[in-house]
Design a protein with these regions (language model features):
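N-terminal intrinsically disordered/low-complexity leader segments
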Residues: 1-8
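Generic helix N-cap/helix-start motif at coil->alpha-helix transitions
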Residues: 65-66
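Short helix-capping/turn signature of helix-turn-helix
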Residues: 50, 103-110
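Amphipathic C-terminal alpha-helical segment
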Residues: 106, 147-166
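Amphipathic alpha-helical packing segments from all-alpha helical-bundle domains
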Residues: 69, 94-98, 110-136, 141-144
Length: 174
């Protein structure tokens, strides 16, 4: 995979637009032409920053993961479950959308390998952080259940169009 050129404001704008599209409708929800139009550049210019759609989606997933993990790492291990729950809930309240890596995970069998690896990285890092709790040790098995509950709760909130569904589904998370 060619490393994208990220030193431009256009690259960031392209990633922002791609993230919105992916969170709304998945990997196949956008084309370079649509993104170029949104950002205000020629569609051929998108290839300067991201040679392929897979490169762009992988960069978006990497950035999403890095931001999410950095926010969780700032929290003490004993409050990470609640911090993760709060982050998922606030993301839904902000724009009614799904977790980027949750959406991509649902399409993982059809994703380019470079994108699927970034999605797996998100879950591996989150599971590691959630099972790192000092008080009342959380096993990997429990961490898997927590992630499944959070992703599923987002899905339910989206289906029902109400954060209440998320709250009810995650009430038992401590």
């Amino acid at each position: 995979m060619a490393r994208p050129r990220l030193k431009s404001n256009n690259a960031g704008k392209l990633m922002d637009a791609a993230e919105r599209h992916i969170r709304q409708s998945g990997y196949n929800a956008f084309s370079f032409r649509e993104l170029a139009k949104e950002v205000g550049i020629k569609s051929s210019s998108v290839h300067y920053y991201f040679p392929t759609k897979a490169d762009l989606a992988a960069a978006v997933a990497r950035r999403y993961t890095d931001r999410f993990v950095a926010a969780l790492q700032e929290k003490s291990p004993s409050v990470r479950i609640q911090a993760c729950k709060k982050a998922f809930r606030e993301a839904y309240l902000t724009d009614g959308q799904m977790c980027l890596c949750g959406v991509l995970a649902s399409e993982s069998a059809a994703l380019p390998e470079v994108v699927a690896l970034e999605v797996r990285r998100f879950f591996d890092l989150c599971l590691g952080l959630l099972s790192e709790r000092k008080e009342g040790a959380v096993t990997r098995k429990v961490a898997l259940g927590i992630m499944a509950k959070l992703e599923g709760a987002l899905l339910l909130a989206r289906v029902y169009g109400a954060v209440r569904a998320f709250d009810e589904a995650t009430r038992s998370l401590q």
